[in-house]
Every structure is written in structure tokens, then in C-alpha cells.
């Protein structure tokens, strides 16, 4: 059984027991969170739309981490202007504990 959930502006296909890296979620490692909204659930039959109001995807926060380093370079011609900028996106690793 799998579900498609939306969190952090992105959609993830998850099944029970999966480890998923999502955009940062507030909470301590070991705490439980509910991922919503649920967009689709597949079991014996596919459920979508208004039938999903009773469906919940529960997850446990495993750790907070950072994504890969993204480097950006700004350059302006003939002026000697150069600037390098870096960014690492904060991520949260969650383990899917149940789809009900």
C-alpha cells in the first residue's frame, strides 16, 4: 500500500517503512508527525479526492540534516566584480510508520 503526500511544496510517493528526505519539519528527532494533505492512496482500490479526509499518513522524525552545497557565481563584465554565494537547504529525514 502506498500514498502520495504533499509537504514542503513537493509531492512524495511513500509506503510504510520508507525513509524520506523532506523539507524541514519542526520537531525533535523521535517525535511523531502527521503528513497532510494526502493526495492519493492505493490499496485494493485507488482512493482520491474527497474520500481522503479520513486518511492519515503518520511518520517519525529520524534526523535533521542539510542538502548538498549549491554554489552560485555572480560576475559583471569589465568591472572586476565577482561574488560567490553558497546555500545548503535544511532537510528532515522521516520514517513512515503508518498509512490509515
From Swiss-Prot:
Transmembrane segments: none annotated. It comes from the Bacteria. Keywords: Ribonucleoprotein, Ribosomal protein, RNA-binding, rRNA-binding. One of its GO terms (biological process) is translation. One of its GO terms (molecular function) is rRNA binding. The keyword Lipid metabolism does not apply. Signal peptide: none annotated. GO terms for cellular component: cytoplasm; ribonucleoprotein complex; ribosome. The keyword Ribonucleoprotein applies. Belongs to the bacterial ribosomal protein bL21 family. This protein binds to 23S rRNA in the presence of protein L20. Part of the 50S ribosomal subunit. Contacts protein L20. This is Large ribosomal subunit protein bL21. It comes from Corynebacterium kroppenstedtii (strain DSM 44385 / JCM 11950 / CIP 105744 / CCUG 35717). The gene is rplU.
